Amino acid sequence: MLLFLLITLLSAIFIFAKRHYTQWQRLGLVSDEAVIPFGSLAKVFRKERPFGLVMYDLYEKFQEQVVGIYLFFKPALLIRDAELARQILTSDFNSFHDRGIYVDEKNDPMSANLFALEGQSWRTLRMKLTPSFSSGKLKGMFETVDDVGNKLLEYLNNQLKDGQTHVLDIKSILTTYAIDIIGSVIFGLEIDSFTNPDNEFRVLSDRSFDNESRSFLSKLQNLTNFVCPPIAKLLTRLGTKEPVVYRLRDIVKRTIEFREENNVVRKDLLHLLIQLRNTGKISDDNDNLWNKVESTATNLKAMSIDMIASNSFLFYIAGSETTASSTSFTIYELAMNPEALKKAQNEVDECLKKHGIKPDGRITYEAIQDMKYLDLCVKETTRKYPGLPFLNRQCTQDFKVPNSKFTIKKDTNVIISLLGLHRDAKYFPEPLAYKPERFADETKDYDAAAYMPFGEGPRHCIAQRMGVMNTKVALAKILANFNIEPMPHKEAEFQFNTAPVLVPVNGLRVGLSKRSFNRR
């Protein structure tokens, strides 16, 4: 009798699961065949492919405009059409204004950042933070970025002091560069990870990106933040927390309190956030922007330390990996494309000469803005290797797909594979070729609707211009002072990681040597 009940129960579960995982077929939608209980993510669970590449594989597998997929238990939709994707992100933003990822403002304030927040909470914070990344603010912070760029230059000079060509893991080196910029500009710390790689901030950074050192629960939470928020919320309620996040919170708290008590002013993003905390707004671009900010009573603060810390951590995660990746992938591609390398290097030389800057001297904000071909290179890199290989949204009100009978129902998650769109020959001829000129006005050769490396619409990356600036500074320093040795073409491969970014297998190794005028 017991055996009969067990068989009946298992059969009922199987029938229910089968029905659940055929939801899209029953609605007449082309869909991926689900693997119970992983849905479309069996390869993610088996650590064979990261989430972004699984979405890319599904993009390549089908031809339809909208494809049904399953994020573990949750039915979702993969958008394969550039115009529809852009419509979701822009003109019909009101139907897709949330990301549908884990956030718990009340019980987990460190989750309440600009990326995850929903509805009015997101709108209010976005409006407050937007002035932080204006041209005037970036110009004010530029000197700090250039300082880190000079430390990068000094480190490379030491590595190449014998005058020979050395093959270096440029991804690892530029990760150090990016982390030091974040530590300095976002967290207000005076650090130099090139000479002191064991400093606390660098150690914490390494831990946050080291997939192997994470516990199983930490990896699970990192994945479920995106694909199954209720499980992420449950794990948090059960006490699963990321130690690195809370240690960085302590660093932010300590720095803010020290600055408020001692009226310390530094031209960085943290100063602007302290200004927002004490006055309720960030000043316009003017001469008084970087003046000291009088502290207000704790109960009158417009922004809590937790909110500053959570958004600082967001800028750190988003900024460090994307800057390191875009810069290192650009160098990697230039090494395989000598014509583009020559154009980029010649432009840097000419711009520095025009602005009266020595190759190893201080670069100015204006000189970086003049490097237009370098802009094309960065655009092409972020096309081929988008910092975030997918975008996700949640339908917040029923939405009828144009020229279709299909309606996306409220609460349905949608995924846009940026890697898929950006490598689709329909939108970008010869998608695996590195062709910066495709973005030049006079030789434009792409469908603009499909290009969205920083997202589009009201929720596009708020720090986009800062990321491009940081990338161009590093590229200009390297191109002005070093030869990038040509190498045979080899497409980068990506390893499994629970973080939603593209992580190259074994880094990116490129040969560098000092340019003749730079020999010591």
UniProtKB/Swiss-Prot annotation:
Topology of the protein relative to the lipid bilayer: Peripheral membrane protein
Positions with a binding annotation for heme: C461
Source species, domain of life: Eukaryota
Cofactor(s) listed: heme
UniProt-annotated location(s): Endoplasmic reticulum membrane; Microsome membrane
EC id: 1.14.-.-
Root EC class: oxidoreductase
Induction or repression: By phenobarbital in susceptible CS (16-fold) and in the LPR (1.6-fold) strains.
Short name of one Pfam family: p450
Effect seen on changing A344V: In allele CYP6D3v1
Gene3D superfamilies per the UniProt record, alphabetical: Cytochrome P450
Sorted UniProt keywords: Endoplasmic reticulum, Heme, Iron, Membrane, Metal-binding, Microsome, Monooxygenase, Oxidoreductase
Effect of V30A: In allele CYP6D3v4
InterPro entries membership: Cyt_P450 (IPR001128), Cyt_P450_CS (IPR017972), Cyt_P450_E_grp-I (IPR002401), Cyt_P450_sf (IPR036396), Insect_CytP450_Detox (IPR050476)
GO molecular function, one term: heme binding
Function of the protein: Metabolizes pyrethroid insecticides and other xenobiotics.
Miscellaneous section: Expressed at higher levels in LPR compared to susceptible flies.
Protein family membership: Belongs to the cytochrome P450 family.
Protein name as annotated: Cytochrome P450 6d3
Originating organism: Musca domestica
